[in-house]
């Protein structure tokens, strides 16, 4: 028996040699004791609960106390880390609720009995040899279920790392220790013959507990003695690491052999060199990392630990709040415009390349290349050195106004495909089924379209003609009837997944991953033409003449349908082109490189015209009224001006920033498909205002304003008025004509508003001006007034440009000069009317009107009646015009002091002096001999001989009388800021404060004295004072000193 003790390979097959046939076990030898203990363990181990089984198993594993045995069992249980064991462990057994079962008294007695047996076996196991421990543990693991095996594997891994760390100076990694078969091992043997050995190295490493000259023995060098070397290795390792099996540890208590549940939880949780980085990071960084996960993965993270569950819950709440805020912003942005005129429309001339017969563009004869700045990049400069022709195209600021948002579907699906062609239905599919969505009632129609064997990847709905086209992963295109949902036709021919489709009349074009573009006849289902790329097709478009297709390589090809040939290939994108749009003149392509490129559809012109940059890949694009509409993967729809590349508006599809997969435009309605929902933007109905109509409306408005002003000036010209400044009465905003009080000369006031004349309001006559001196004179006045009305025709009046000086604020001097010019023009012969009352100018600084006014609004009434009443209320007077002769004296310029040579011909007019010749200086007293005077004194048919006192504007003299009339301007007193003065926050005494003030004053005086004085300016100021007769005592001449003792203004 002692000879076979070390043969572990035959350990399960050891038998007692002392036993008889009637009693096979002697119960004295180690083999019989082991067999009896295993038999008794099988009786109760499978009947106890999971907690007791786990406690007993962990207690057994803790008593191994051998690095060799721990490594041996770790290798055996390594298969428990596979996916099948992990899946079985993650399952929850709902039939057993541990800890909540009410135990009866009998069960409690049985538990106590079983616990006593477990303690006895643990005590026996702790005092057993390594051979007994190895065999009993192997047989015990055979009775464990998968969950217990996983627990055992975790506990053994933790215990092994603990034992390894307890050995100080262990320089050999555990990977250098392994099991290897003996060299004389036969494959026919029932058990595997293994022994523990160290991997061969260049140098042997000593163990910590051994002397320096003792080394771990490797494999047997002599092939004749494998068993001795194996025995020596095992005994040496057992001696070094665990000592003798029958020696218990100091302080060993057999009552504590059963492990508590807390210790089991700590051991079975596993031991790893990795750390939970989410727990160690700050909370905001942990939430930022978890926020990058999708919702499904975030729900899984909540099962990792309590900390992760709390973080995941907070991230969900933050995402929900952020989404709510962004959705509110999305709804509110529909009623906000960034200074863009949403009603703008115009017809502009757009350059297009001029082509020759072979379809190539014409270049200029003498090309000039010029570097363009950022502001110079537009459509007109894109055709550099190319001959172009102008095409009239309409432009509008589409989708720049206010809009309402309606959610049609709120289901997250990144594989959703939709199509909308106007009307009330939307075709939606994300798998093999297709259903229709009513956008008015926001509900699905019960008709479903089934028949595809694979998921649907392309749709085209034609609601007007009552059919639906769908392209699928099953390589087929199906033609469906909308009302019945029956597939009536199948288009077969593609050898790859259908990725895109487009329809024009009865021609269908489709592209697939088989690098083919096929043209079909919708009525017959036959393939008419096939075009090929070298890469899978991602987008295709068709019209009556051309087909445009793009592929994953980034190439865009234009095909001619009738001729079935390639027109041109457009290259410039660095990524796959996913979307296309083209019309008669231009082509747009959107790519994964974040660019939308504009090309010309005319002939074979292949140069890129414009590029519109996006932060992420472009998924859909359209061109409408010279406005580029693009959908980006950042969740925004952008509207660009095609002419200059400016971004006019940005529409957010949702608050989460999900990519906009596609959008469809019909009228003032836009249907948007994102990964998280389907939206409809309903824009307001806009009446477009073209630039030509605006100019016409502006001209008509100006003509109406001119007519109103002319009628107002006609009224003012027929009455005695006084012009009053708006500064006198701020509350008065209208034009007023006021009759004067009796006893004063005929006078009236006019208050001019600075804005345009929207209406004219007359002040009614407050009191009669008195009866006329003779009724004959009144009759004559009426007669003359009627004659005057006949003479005042628009054709006879001279044409004058419209003056807009009243529409802008002016200074008082400008206002008085304007009134004076009007008076002189009024007194001239061209505007001289009989019976026209004179006007006098009231000083602009004079007092405002103190007497009450009665305002009469004659809007809608006859103005002529009011004019006649005002004309008859003022008696006419005779008018005589006089003039003062002028004296003109011509001067000869002195050319000697000219800066130019005498040979240079001068263009300066001859100077002259013009001054009035007064009566005292004239020879002959009152005789008038001047021809100019005779011409001036001649009377016309509309003049009289009575003298008029001229209305002159005299410059006010500087004096107290004039200054008193002027309004004193309000003085603004600003208090000093104490914080600005006491910026240093220094506490000073009274004496220190005085010293500080004196120092500041000296500093200020020194700064003022150092100022540079211009001697020229000082001399000029002195001469001016001397001319005015003012003293110049304070004037100091340069280099001289004033000597007042010698006399006034005497300098030495």
UniProtKB/Swiss-Prot annotation:
Residue ranges of coiled coil: 690-719, 986-1010
F-box domain mapped to chain residues: 276-323
GO cellular component, one term: cytosol
Compositionally biased tracts (Basic and acidic residues): 775-786
Keywords: Coiled coil, Repeat, Ubl conjugation pathway, WD repeat
WD repeats, residue ranges: 169-206, 409-447, 451-490, 493-532, 534-569, 572-609, 611-652
Induction: By disease-causing laminin A mutants also inducing CBX5 and CBX1 proteasomal degradation.
Stretches for region Disordered: 766-805
Reported function: Probable substrate-recognition component of a SCF (SKP1-CUL1-F-box protein)-type E3 ubiquitin ligase complex which mediates the ubiquitination and subsequent proteasomal degradation of target proteins. Overexpression is leading to degradation of CBX5 and CBX1.
Entry protein name: F-box/WD repeat-containing protein 10
Species the sequence originates in: Homo sapiens (Human)
Encoding gene per record: FBXW10
């Amino acid at each position: 028996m002692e000879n076979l003790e070390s043969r572990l390979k035959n350990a399960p097959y050891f038998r007692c040699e002392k036993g008889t046939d009637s009693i096979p076990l002697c119960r004295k030898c180690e083999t019989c004791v082991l067999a009896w203990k295993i038999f008794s363990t099988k009786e109760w181990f499978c009947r106890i609960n999971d907690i007791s089984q786990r406690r007993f198993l962990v207690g057994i594993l803790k008593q191994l106390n051998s690095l060799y045995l721990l490594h041996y069992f770790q290798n055996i249980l390594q298969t428990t880390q596979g996916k099948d064991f992990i899946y079985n462990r993650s399952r929850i057994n709902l039939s057993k609720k541990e800890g909540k079962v009410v135990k009866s008294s009998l069960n409690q007695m049985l538990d106590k009995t079983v616990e006593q047996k477990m303690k006895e076996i643990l005590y026996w196991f702790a005092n057993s040899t390594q051979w007994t421990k190895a065999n009993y543990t192997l047989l015990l693991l055979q009775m464990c279920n998968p969950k217990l095996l996983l627990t055992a594997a975790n506990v053994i891994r933790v215990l092994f790392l603990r034992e390894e760390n307890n050995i100080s100076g262990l320089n050999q990694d555990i990977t250098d220790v392994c099991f290897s078969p003996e060299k004389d091992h036969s494959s026919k043997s029932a058990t595997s013959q293994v022994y523990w050995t160290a991997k061969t190295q260049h140098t042997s490493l000593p163990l910590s507990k051994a002397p320096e000259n003792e080394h771990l023995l490797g494999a047997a060098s002599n092939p004749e003695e494998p068993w001795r070397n194996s025995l020596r290795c095992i005994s040496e390792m057992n001696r070094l690491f665990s000592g003798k099996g029958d020696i218990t540890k100091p302080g060993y208590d057999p009552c504590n052999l059963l492990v508590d549940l807390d210790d089991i939880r700590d051991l079975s949780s596993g031991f790893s060199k990795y750390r939970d980085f989410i727990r160690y990071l700050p909370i905001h960084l942990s939430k930022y990392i978890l926020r990058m996960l999708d919702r499904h993965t975030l729900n899984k993270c909540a099962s990792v630990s309590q900390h992760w569950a709390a973080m995941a819950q907070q991230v969900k709440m933050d995402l929900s709040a952020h989404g709510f805020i962004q959705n509110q912003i999305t709804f509110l942005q529909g009623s906000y415009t960034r200074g863009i005129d949403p009603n703008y429309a115009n017809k502009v001339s757009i350059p297009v390349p001029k082509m020759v017969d072979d379809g190539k563009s014409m270049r200029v004869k003498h090309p000039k290349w010029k570097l363009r700045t950022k502001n110079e990049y537009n459509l007109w400069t894109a055709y550099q050195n190319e001959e172009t022709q102008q095409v009239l195209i309409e432009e509008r600021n589409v989708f720049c106004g206010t809009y309402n948002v309606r959610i049609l579907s709120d289901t997250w699906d990144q594989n959703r495909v939709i199509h909308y062609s106007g009307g009330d239905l939307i075709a939606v599919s994300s798998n093999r089924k297709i259903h229709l969505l009513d956008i008015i009632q926001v509900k699905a129609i019960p008709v479903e379209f089934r028949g595809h064997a694979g998921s649907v990847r392309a749709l085209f709905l034609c609601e007007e003609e009552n059919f639906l086209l769908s392209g699928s992963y099953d390589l087929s295109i199906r033609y469906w009837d909308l009302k019945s949902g029956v597939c009536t036709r199948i288009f077969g021919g593609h050898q790859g997944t259908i990725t895109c489709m487009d329809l024009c009349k009865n021609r269908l074009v489709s592209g697939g991953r088989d690098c083919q573009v096929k043209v079909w006849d919708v009525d017959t289902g036959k393939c008419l033409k096939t075009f090929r790329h070298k890469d899978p097709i991602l987008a295709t478009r068709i019209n009556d003449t051309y087909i445009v297709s793009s592929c994953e390589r980034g190439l865009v090809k234009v095909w001619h349908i009738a001729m079935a040939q390639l027109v041109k290939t457009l290259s410039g994108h660095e990524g796959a082109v996913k979307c296309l749009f083209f019309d008669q003149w231009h082509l747009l392509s959107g790519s994964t490189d974040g660019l939308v490129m504009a090309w010309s559809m005319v002939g074979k012109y292949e140069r890129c015209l414009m590029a519109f940059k996006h932060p992420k890949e472009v998924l859909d694009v359209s061109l409408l009224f010279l406005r580029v509409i693009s959908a980006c993967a950042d969740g925004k729809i952008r509207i660009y001006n095609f002419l200059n590349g400016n971004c006019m508006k940005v529409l957010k599809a949702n608050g989460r920033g999900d990519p906009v997969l596609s959008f469809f435009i019909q009228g003032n309605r836009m249907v948007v498909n994102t990964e998280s929902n389907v939206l409809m933007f309903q824009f307001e109905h806009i009446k477009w205002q073209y630039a030509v109509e605006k100019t016409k409306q502006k001209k008509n408005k100006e003509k109406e304003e001119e007519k109103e002003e002319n009628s107002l000036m006609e009224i003012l010209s027929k009455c005695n008025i006084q012009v009053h400044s708006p500064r006198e009465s701020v509350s008065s905003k209208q034009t007023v004509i006021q009759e004067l009080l009796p006893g004063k000369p005929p006078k009236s006031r006019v208050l001019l508003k600075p804005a345009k004349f929207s209406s004219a309001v007359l002040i009614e006559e407050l009191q009669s001006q008195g009866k006329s001196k003779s009724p004959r004179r009144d009759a004559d006045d009426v007669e003359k007034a009627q004659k005057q009305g006949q003479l005042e025709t628009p054709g006879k009046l001279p044409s004058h440009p419209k003056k807009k000086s009243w529409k802008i604020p002016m200074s008082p001097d400008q206002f008085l000069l304007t009134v004076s010019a009007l008076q002189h023009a009024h007194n001239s012969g061209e505007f001289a009317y009989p019976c026209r009352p004179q006007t006098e100018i009231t000083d602009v600084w004079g007092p405002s009107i103190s007497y009450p006014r009665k305002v009469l609004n004659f809007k809608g009434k006859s103005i002529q009646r009011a004019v006649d009443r005002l004309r008859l209320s003022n008696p006419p007077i005779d008018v005589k015009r006089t003039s003062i002769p002028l004296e003109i004296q011509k001067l000869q310029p002195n050319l000697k002091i000219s800066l130019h040579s005498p040979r240079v011909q001068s263009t300066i007019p001859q100077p002259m002096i013009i001054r009035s010749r007064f009566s005292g200086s004239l020879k002959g007293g009152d005789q008038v001999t001047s021809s100019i005077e005779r011409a001036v004194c001649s009377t016309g048919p509309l003049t009289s001989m009575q003298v008029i006192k001229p209305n002159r504007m005299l410059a006010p003299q500087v004096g107290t009388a004039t200054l008193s009339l002027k309004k004193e301007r309000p003085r603004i007193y600003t208090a000093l800021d104490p914080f600005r003065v006491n910026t240093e926050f220094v506490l000073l005494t009274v004496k220190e404060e005085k010293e500080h003030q004196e120092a500041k004053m000296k500093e200020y005086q020194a700064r003022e004295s150092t100022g540079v004085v211009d001697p020229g300016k000082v001399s000029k100021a002195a001469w001016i004072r001397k001319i005015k007769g003012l003293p110049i005592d304070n004037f100091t001449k340069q280099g001289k000193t004033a000597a007042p003792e010698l006399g006034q203004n005497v300098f030495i």
